[in-house]
């Protein structure tokens, strides 16, 4: 074994091989660290919610909830860009082209920095007008703005971590991003208690704690890459990225970014409809959405695993392996749905009470109903997410983007037509209905992909 081969073996010793061996076993091994990472990343926001709800009350909880969709809009575009850049890196890794991989990293840093700064500036000037446009109740407007503006100023920190973690996952290493998040999540809990309960900083303390904790993740991730994963560090010659690769990175990242932001924009529109239903309804919905963010994690984690799996096997030229993998992912989504339905039927109201800290009947009733009505559609959501990510990984940039337009238009229709008539019941049914339409569309597009399903000669 040569010195170069030995070095590469050491560098990739934590990697899961997604291009060879048993498919489902490899997917699960790769997915589990992502699932645990997502769990602790969600704890950033959920710990905020629990402490805010229990220490500061329902009004402060509603303030954070009222800007939740805007937060997703701000961050979603940046995260989508990061995922798009990682897809290109995973293809290069699957093709075993180290030079292309390093040039991809160099181009990703340039595009990522520009995108995150743009998002931060847009949020800085547009957040207050957007909160007012969304008819945020006057009693929570100032707290909502105080929380979201701090989060906005930390977007670059969140983006930096997700890009770094995405590049590690692109080469099959999903373990180290988990380690960094475990450490920073513990810090986040300590800072939450200190800033909110100890120093009396209110909702601003929750936002500051989240940004600082995620900043620690960034530092740890960068130090690890510099010390142990030199293959992700471009040299001077790799700074000449080339127009073609820049375009591939730009178009892939913009497609993913727009897809995420259009979905988030639909959530902003839906939040407008929810804001008109009163503070207690907002509080109940906020608690339910926090719990939903936990229960759909197994689906999101597998969709992320599908993205890397499909990207690497696309780069390696293995369509049959992609077909088999996607079938197993669809079956996995069905199992997740069954488990979630059983859990929600038994414990939905107790979970809402635990997260919100509220004893108001309307808060508990609405939150529990949301969880019980949406959980039977989790199999559809799993198919939607994994197929959307797979199509992006196959180089489809426009057709998956169209699915997010369907979602946006569906939410607009519900806000204008159904929520005024059926109130919170329409809010609950909005997303399951949209999921069904999008899943049908995306599966049809996937079945027509010429690489995965080539026409017989």
Residue ranges and their predicted role:
Residues 82, 151-169, 177-185, 206-221, ...:
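Short runs within selected transmembrane alpha-helices of multi-pass transporters and secretion channels
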Residues 41, 45, 49, 53, ...:
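Juxtamembrane/transmembrane-helix interface segments of polytopic membrane transporters
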Residues 34-87, 151-158, 220, 247-313, ...:
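Transmembrane helix-bundle signature of multi-pass secondary active exporters and lipid flippases
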């Amino acid at each position: 074994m040569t010195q170069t081969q030995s070095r590469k073996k050491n560098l990739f010793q934590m990697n899961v091989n997604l291009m060879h061996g048993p498919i489902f076993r490899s997917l699960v091994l790769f997915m589990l660290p992502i699932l645990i990472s997502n769990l602790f990343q969600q704890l950033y926001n959920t710990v905020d919610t629990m402490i805010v709800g229990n220490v500061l009350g329902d009004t402060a909880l509603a303030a954070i909830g009222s800007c939740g969709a805007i937060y997703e809009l701000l961050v979603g575009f940046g995260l989508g860009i990061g995922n798009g850049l990682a897809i290109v890196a995973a293809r290069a890794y699957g093709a075993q082209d180290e030079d292309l991989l390093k040039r991809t990293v160099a181009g990703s840093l340039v595009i990522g920095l520009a995108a995150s700064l743009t998002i931060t500036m847009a949020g800085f000037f547009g957040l207050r007008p957007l909160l007012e446009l969304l008819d945020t109740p006057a009693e929570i407007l100032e707290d909502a703005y105080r929380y979201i503006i701090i989060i906005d100023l930390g977007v670059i920190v969140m983006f930096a971590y997700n890009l770094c973690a995405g590049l590690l996952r692109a080469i099959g290493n999903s373990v180290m991003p988990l380690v960094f998040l475990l450490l920073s999540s513990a810090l986040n809990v300590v800072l939450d208690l200190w800033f909110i309960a100890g120093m009396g900083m209110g909702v601003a303390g929750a936002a500051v704690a989240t940004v600082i904790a995620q900043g620690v993740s960034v530092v740890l991730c960068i130090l690890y890459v510099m010390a142990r994963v030199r293959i992700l560090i471009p040299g001077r010659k790799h700074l000449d990225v080339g127009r073609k690769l820049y375009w591939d990175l730009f178009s892939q990242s913009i497609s993913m970014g727009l897809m995420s932001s259009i979905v988030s924009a639909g959530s902003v529109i839906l939040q407008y409809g929810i804001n008109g239903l009163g503070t207690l309804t907002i509080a109940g919905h906020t608690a339910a959405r926090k719990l939903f963010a936990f229960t759909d994690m197994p689906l999101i984690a597998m969709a992320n695993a599908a993205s890397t799996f499909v990207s690497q096997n696309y780069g390696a030229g293995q369509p049959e392996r992609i077909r088999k993998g996607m079938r197993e992912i669809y079956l996995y989504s069905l199992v997740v749905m069954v488990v979630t339905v059983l859990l929600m039927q038994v414990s939905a109201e107790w979970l809402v009470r635990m997260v919100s800290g509220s004893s108001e009947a309307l808060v508990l009733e609405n939150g529990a109903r949301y969880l019980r009505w949406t959980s039977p559609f989790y199999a559809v959501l799993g198919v939607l997410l994994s197929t959307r990510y797979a199509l992006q990984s196959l180089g489809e940039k426009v057709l998956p983007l169209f699915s997010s337009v369907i979602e946006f238009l569906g939410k607009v229709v519900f806000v204008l037509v159904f929520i005024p008539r059926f109130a919170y019941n329409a809010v609950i049914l909005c997303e399951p209905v949209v999921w069904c339409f999008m899943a049908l569309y995306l599966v049809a597009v996937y079945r027509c992909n010429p690489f995965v399903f080539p026409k017989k000669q």
